[in-house]
């Protein structure tokens, strides 16, 4: 049975500090490194084959992926795609989440953070966290560089990439591993499980805990489950 393995990167330094990260290229925390190694080990222990891998342009996802591949004695060959980057948080980037909630109020905070189609105010070009024009993003067409994104905006880049690049591997019965981010994976799960615009705000993707989706013929989902059961809540996507 063909498998799609989705893993959010291990905890990042800014995750630990409870800050909005987005496209800033922050590193893994010590805990995040451990989570990545544990993800690789559990995949190995369960003898889950990985045929092809994808990740974003951001080091926290790349390092998580390389840790998993090393644990499984696999060649460090993988595909990077900016379309799998985290959602761009605009002017919220770098801010502490609790402090931001107190400043703008809980209702507005929830809209910016969890709504389907509301984006935060755009990041200014002179922001200290502006990374769009760094060499890291040189291959991205200028017109596609976001200064802010809603989850819908993230969905609109993740899903076409899945359809055009990733899906064909699943059709060929290859097991695919994607190491990405909370919101890019939420967007993909919304698509795969047909989650409604209102229910998607309830979906949380934990760091460093691979989610396996098993497909029958014609890519019909048979079952899905987190590998680390000790840290996984019940997964209910069909909403």
Question: Where are these predicted regions, by residue range?
Answer:
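Active-site-adjacent alpha-helix immediately C-terminal to a catalytic or transition-state-stabilizing loop
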Residues: 4, 62, 70-72, 145-148, ...
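Active-site glycine-centered loops adjacent to acidic/histidine catalytic or metal-binding residues
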Residues: 9, 83, 181
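Loop-to-helix element that buttresses phosphate recognition and phosphoryl-transfer chemistry
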Residues: 11-67, 71, 79, 145-160, ...
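Flexible, glycine-rich phosphate/dinucleotide-binding loops
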Residues: 13, 87, 118, 185, ...
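Phosphate-coordination/substrate-recognition cap region in phosphate-metabolizing enzymes
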Residues: 40-129, 139, 190-212, 238
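Alpha-helix-centered segments that form part of catalytic cores
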Residues: 117, 122-161
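Acidic, His/Gly-rich catalytic cores of divalent-metal-dependent hydrolytic chemistry
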Residues: 228-239
